[in-house]
Swiss-Prot record:
Keywords: DNA damage, DNA recombination, DNA repair, Metal-binding, Zinc, Zinc-finger. This is Recombination protein RecR. It comes from Corynebacterium glutamicum (strain ATCC 13032 / DSM 20300 / JCM 1318 / BCRC 11384 / CCUG 27702 / LMG 3730 / NBRC 12168 / NCIMB 10025 / NRRL B-2784 / 534). One of its GO terms (biological process) is DNA repair. It comes from the Bacteria.
Length: 218
């Protein structure tokens, strides 16, 4: 154990995903030896993320504006919505060049052990985008007033691109049942070939591209 600000920094770095105590210690000692201007830029970048990033009011992706660049792009196919767990998953799919529709970010996956149920995810706003009504009364009661917006009547297909793990599959199954209430809506899931038990962000572009193009209707 170190003392004072150094140990405080190590403790805070250790709280970051994927950063253990040893990695946090290496990063902290690296920061002790960098130019002060590098520290200043890091502080400014952290402040910029906190103050300059918000969530798109339509798809819940991270954005600098009220509506993100993808939702604002008239060239995107508004009739197809790809549902993902986190904003980082959008970047993975975009790199394939296979998808030209729009997205919806759930903000996680169903996980009863972590007390994450439907009300903790951005499910109600997805249902509103599709049909403007909420078939689940519990979800309707949990929707903040400032989240309401008109439905997109041209939505033809919803692609469930949650992670191929236990939580992701449970979330896709739950959403599939909810979306069955919307007539004429095609509901699809990424095709087989995705590694079971993994996260979307670690799937290579070729595999993901094939999974998108070969998606299966459910």
């Amino acid at each position: 154990m170190f003392e004072g600000p150094l140990q405080d920094l190590i403790d805070e770095l250790s709280r970051l995903p994927g950063v253990g105590p040893k990695s946090a210690q290496r990063i902290a000692f690296h920061l002790l030896n960098v130019d002060p201007s590098d520290i200043t830029r890091l502080q400014e970048a952290l402040g910029g993320v906190r103050d300059g990033v918000q969530f798109c009011r339509i798809c819940c992706n991270i954005s600098r504006e009220e509506v993100c660049r993808i939702c604002s792009d008239s060239g995107r196919d508004g009739g197809t919505i790809c549902v993902v767990e986190e904003p980082k998953d959008i970047q993975v799919i975009e790199r394939t060049g296979e998808f030209s529709g729009r997205y919806h970010v759930l903000g996680g996956a169903l996980d009863p052990l972590a007390n994450i149920g439907p009300r903790e995810l951005n499910i109600s706003t997805l249902l509103q985008r599709i049909g403007g009504v909420l078939p689940d009364r519990e979800l309707a009661d949990s929707t903040p007033e400032n989240k309401l917006f008109d439905a997109t009547p041209t939505v033809r297909e919803v692609i469930l691109a949650t992670d191929p793990n236990t939580e992701g599959e449970a979330t896709a199954s739950y959403l599939g049942r909810l979306l069955k209430d919307f007539p004429d809506l095609v509901i699809s899931r990424l095709a087989s070939g995705m590694p079971l038990g993994g996260d979307l962000e670690f799937v290579d572009e070729l595999t993901l591209s094939r999974a998108l193009s070969g998606r299966l209707q459910i």
